[in-house]
């Protein structure tokens, strides 16, 4: 993994629960004690930029492999939570005064520990988290302006590297990507894939507070239409089959259990 720091996360999890940055062997040993379920370790990418890139295969490539592989349906920027000091108020007070962070004040205060009582200097930026997850305080905004031919080509190549146990290609999902800058992202350079979410992922740009509810629903409906089209193409080609009601129920129960941890 290239040495510490490294990332530890539950093998089955959601909303950033159980994710930690481990700085040394002692941190890893403690994580093994604290985490009762199977977990994975991965290389740490410092960013500082993180985005979610939702990629969808063109349905015709299922039967016509020579066709262009897929396209970026949506992309969202992830703004990590922070407060800005005024030289008067403590970090705790700044959190409680913040129009957004006060809704998750309990989490931020617990995370900051004793540091919550420090008074940052005027204009000093204090990070409250470094995980690109809504539930961990990150704010998602639409990043359609980041989509370029270079980035699309790079994501196509990455998606092409995935195969299931039957040798079938990857069809749809969201890559959570870290990189050094938006400029590097547009060029498709120096990307670090921190997570890949499959069919149950979503176009997380729908959570942009500056976008309307109607726009969000239109984006989701478009996503579901693509899912339906791909499923139909797989079934027609014989490379896929519908799941049974029992399988659907088991998947739902697994999801609900993961969300309740």
Name every feature range the model reports, one short phrase each.
Residues 4-8, 38-42, 174:
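A short linear hydrophobic-aromatic micro-motif
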Residues 5-28, 50-52:
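Glycine-rich phosphate-binding loop of ATP-grasp-fold ATP-dependent ligases
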Residues 12-13, 45-48, 169-171:
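A short catalytic or substrate-binding loop motif that flags glycine-/basic-rich loops and adjacent residues
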Residues 23-146, 150, 154, 158-163, ...:
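Phosphate-binding site of ATP-dependent enzymes
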Residues 158-165, 199-203:
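Hydrophobic alpha-helical segments
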Residues 165-167, 171-178:
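Substrate-recognition/cap regions that form aromatic- and gly/pro-loop-enriched pockets
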Residues 170, 180-261:
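C-terminal active-site "lid" helix and adjoining low-complexity regulatory extension at the edge
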